[in-house]
Amino acid sequence: MAAPLKGFLETTSDLWLSGAMIDKPAAVFASASSLHGGHEAVLQSMMTPLLHHGMLVMGCPYSDPGLAMTEGGGTPYGPTHLDADSLRPHEEAMAHRLGQRLAKWSQHV
């Protein structure tokens, strides 16, 4: 996880203690400089504090066609971008679909 994000999350103790984020939907996304550059580990490290907050973390279901692509980013934990190149169409589409799911569930809370 990037240091600025970690620093921000460390300032959310009051929200955690008050339970203000419980049942709020959340999702994560990331980029890495190589295909096996730790995409999953980065996403999981970002999910941990969200789960501690009691948030409802969603990822990309295996029905997402982007997960079948092997030449770029994308994991069940969230969309990723292989930043060695420009954004690939399937990476952008996965991020858009996850954003749509997040927006849909946000209307219910």
Model-found features: residue ranges?
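Glycine-rich phosphate/pyrophosphate-binding loop and the adjoining helix
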Residues: 56-109
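Helix-loop-strand module that forms the ligand-binding subsite of alpha/beta enzymes
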Residues: 1-65
